[in-house]
């Protein structure tokens, strides 16, 4: 049975008369794999899945994880490797990732930074052991490719700030949101209303991340089913016309039509041509989803900004968009 595409009569088989959205939500919650919280004294892994990183810049983050969070940190070879713009060859980075996925002592895996290169590794990784011993895989931006692939396995992953950014100025809220999810503390988000919001309520698994990467994996082994899900989007340094092109790609490929909710994060440092495109990123997205009726939240603190709150991809969440604000709440029952 394909758990990512449940039969429409699933609720009927349970003898429950529910709306289709609630049926999908219930179905996914029954079969999703929740990851147990980490604890002080646990071991975590730190590697670089994509671009090379200055190891000296990571030392404060490593110290924080060891001293403030009480964790033991295993360091990957990729942290000190370099191959052109990458953190070592594909083989070096893949070996790090495979080792940390397979090591039962490692309870979470942090990618030090994004950039480009994660998707180059995915077809060489064996996720069999990972499916039996679940652990958090953490990162954002280019790491969206990894989140998508993990979602095809019906396992959670964590879209969140990365060690390279742990101690950036005014980044305490992002770091604390990551710590709370990792250690299993209740994390319910509330934000102020946005004038472009479309009101409504939704329940479903959260999916998403970087728009360019989501479009990049369409048609690949890492492509995911969007039906019945709450999608969140963010991006950085993209031309406005390209944001429009990517949203059209999501729409034409059928990714938007069966969503139950949409969360629009930051679209930072957007570029434009000499002849302006004529719309902002938010306006482009608004136009792309205008024909649908699911709730839409704009201005959520996720993306390439100081405020980049941790979002558990694949977790069953409730989104409520009201006139006076927005709330996002999750299911925190662990197996």
Language-model segments: which ranges?
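ATP/NTP phosphate-donor binding region
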Residues: 27-105
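Conserved beta-alpha junction segments in alpha/beta enzyme cores
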Residues: 53, 57, 205-236
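N-terminal glycine-rich "phosphate-gripper" loop used for MgATP/nucleotide binding
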Residues: 108-119
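Short, acidic/small-residue loops that bind anionic groups at enzyme active sites
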Residues: 127-149, 156-162
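Conserved anion/nucleotide-ligand pocket segment
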Residues: 156-213
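Internal helical hairpin/lid segments
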Residues: 225-281
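ATP/nucleoside-binding phosphotransfer catalytic cores, i.e., glycine-rich phosphate-binding loops
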Residues: 269-335
């Amino acid at each position: 049975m394909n758990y990512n595409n449940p039969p429409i009569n699933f609720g009927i088989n349970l003898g429950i008369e529910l709306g289709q959205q609630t049926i999908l939500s219930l179905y996914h919650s029954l079969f999703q794999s929740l990851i147990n919280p980490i604890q002080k004294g646990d071991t975590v892994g730190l590697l670089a899945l994509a671009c090379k990183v200055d190891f000296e810049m990571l030392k404060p983050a490593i110290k924080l994880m060891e001293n403030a969070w009480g964790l033991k940190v295993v360091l990957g070879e990729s942290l000190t490797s370099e191959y052109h713009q990458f953190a070592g060859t594909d083989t070096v980075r893949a070996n790090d990732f495979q080792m940390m996925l397979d090591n039962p002592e490692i309870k979470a895996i942090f990618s030090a930074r994004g950039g480009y290169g994660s998707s180059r590794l995915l077809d060489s990784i064996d996720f069999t052991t990972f499916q039996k011993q679940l652990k958090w895989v953490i990162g954002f931006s280019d790491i969206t490719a990894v989140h998508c692939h993990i979602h095809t396995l019906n396992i959670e992953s964590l879209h969140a700030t990365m060690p390279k950014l742990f101690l950036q100025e005014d980044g305490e809220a992002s770091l604390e949101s990551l710590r709370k999810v990792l250690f299993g503390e209740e994390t319910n988000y509330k934000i102020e209303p946005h004038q472009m919001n479309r009101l409504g309520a939704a329940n479903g698994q959260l999916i998403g991340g970087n728009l360019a990467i989501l479009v990049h994996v369409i048609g690949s082994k890492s492509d995911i089913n969007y039906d019945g899900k709450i999608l969140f989007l963010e991006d950085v340094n993209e031309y406005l016309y390209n944001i429009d092109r990517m949203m059209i790609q999501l729409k034409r490929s059928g990714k938007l039509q069966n969503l139950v909710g949409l969360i629009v994060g930051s679209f930072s440092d957007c570029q434009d041509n000499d002849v302006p495109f004529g719309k902002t990123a938010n306006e482009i997205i608004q136009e792309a989803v205008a024909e649908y009726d699911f709730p839409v939240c704009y201005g959520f603190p996720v993306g390439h900004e100081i405020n980049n709150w941790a979002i558990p991809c694949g977790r069953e969440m409730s989104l409520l968009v009201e006139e006076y604000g927005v709330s996002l709440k999750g299911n925190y029952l662990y197996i």
